[in-house]
């Protein structure tokens, strides 16, 4: 759960680690507790590498992390011990020994994100921080608009200024809208995603719905390669990294 953390990655300022809770910070503290540094690791502290960066408030059910160690680890025992040390809102679900060539980020072939919306006029006690849309969403219109994003495109219109990779080209293999009761889920899967790309796509969908713009507006925004043409970047609450494929 990402609500109580300043994102997945340890934060630095002027070369020094900022004292703020992060998923990476909690994982590395737990690892240091469990793994006694061997002779070959004295000058190489345990460092975790994530499959991708998530912001404050973003949840993850499928985050993949790798680290190097020269110690022998028994998976079932290690998972139990890690989860005993970690805070209640972070857990390790699986552990595998991988080849030295494996890299959690660079070896990834696809990432699947899901954004959850509440489509209801009135709030309820257990809504939490999930974005609530008061007007009725037309799922068929939303799906047609999302279809313009399938395939390989330059997604510059949907990036935020924090995007570090110079390439803005992504290949989207899945873009679906699903409605279950008063919940609407946007499913997006692709080889890579730009910073805040999913949240801005959702914001553009809501702009199309809220202002009753033609569904072709999504195509125009995509082809403009201009962030100013897209909708707002919606709240991180409701966004979940569901799966990373290798």
Task: Label each region the model flagged.
Residues 2-246:
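Structured-RNA-binding interfaces characteristic of tRNA pseudouridine synthases
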């Amino acid at each position: 759960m990402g609500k109580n953390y300043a994102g997945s990655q340890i934060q630095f300022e002027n070369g020094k680690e900022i004292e703020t809770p992060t998923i990476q910070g909690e994982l590395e503290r737990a690892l240091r507790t469990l793994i006694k540094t061997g002779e070959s690791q004295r000058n190489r502290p345990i460092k975790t590498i994530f499959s991708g960066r998530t912001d404050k408030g973003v949840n993850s059910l499928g985050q993949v992390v790798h680290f190097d160690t020269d110690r022998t680890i028994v998976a079932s025992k290690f998972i139990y011990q890690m989860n005993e040390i970690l805070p209640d809102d972070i857990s390790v679900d699986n552990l595998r020994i991988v080849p030295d060539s494996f890299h959690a980020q660079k070896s990834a072939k696809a990432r699947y994100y899901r954004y959850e919306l509440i489509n209801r006029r009135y709030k309820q006690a257990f809504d939490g921080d999930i974005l609530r849309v008061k007007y009725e969403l037309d799922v068929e219109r939303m799906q047609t608009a999302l279809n313009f994003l399938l395939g390989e495109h330059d997604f510059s219109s949907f990036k935020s200024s924090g995007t570090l990779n110079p390439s803005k080209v992504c290949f989207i293999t899945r873009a679906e809208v699903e409605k279950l009761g008063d919940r609407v889920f946007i499913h997006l899967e692709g080889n890579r995603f730009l910073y805040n790309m999913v949240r801005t796509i959702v914001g553009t969908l809501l702009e199309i719905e809220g202002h009753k713009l033609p569904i072709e507006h999504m195509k125009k925004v995509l082809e403009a390669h201009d962030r100013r043409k897209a909708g707002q970047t919606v709240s991180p609450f409701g966004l979940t990294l569901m799966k990373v494929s290798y």
